[in-house]
């Protein structure tokens, strides 16, 4: 029974994911900290959430013109790897 990257066998490869960020980094940044107010930060995001979101963008279940175009050519492995990379980034949150 496979899960959304919650099963270790389904988990992506963060190193491979970093190599696949050519398109992603344009909006979300290589470090996952977006400088684009229209694109969310992905650094430190929950891996299973990223897998679910990218899978839904790819299928068209989730709508965003840019993301639907970008995600349509991603394989399951690409999605798992990119999600693993962004989830692996440590984000320090400072108190206000």
Regions found by a protein language model. Name each.
Residues 37:
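Short beta-to-alpha loop/turn elements within the nucleotide-binding domains of ABC transporters
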Residues 9-33, 43-45, 94-96:
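Sequence/structural segment immediately N-terminal to covalent heme-attachment motifs in c-type
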């Amino acid at each position: 029974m496979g899960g959304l990257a919650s099963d270790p066998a389904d988990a992506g490869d963060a190193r491979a994911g970093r190599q696949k960020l050519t398109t992603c980094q344009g909006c979300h940044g290589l470090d996952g900290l977006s400088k684009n107010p229209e694109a969310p930060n992905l650094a430190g995001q929950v891996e299973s959430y990223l897998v679910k979101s990218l899978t839904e963008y790819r299928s068209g279940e989730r709508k965003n013109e840019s993301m639907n175009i970008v995600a349509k050519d991603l394989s399951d492995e690409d999605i798992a790897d990119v999600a693993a990379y962004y989830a692996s980034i440590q984000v320090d949150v400072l108190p206000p």
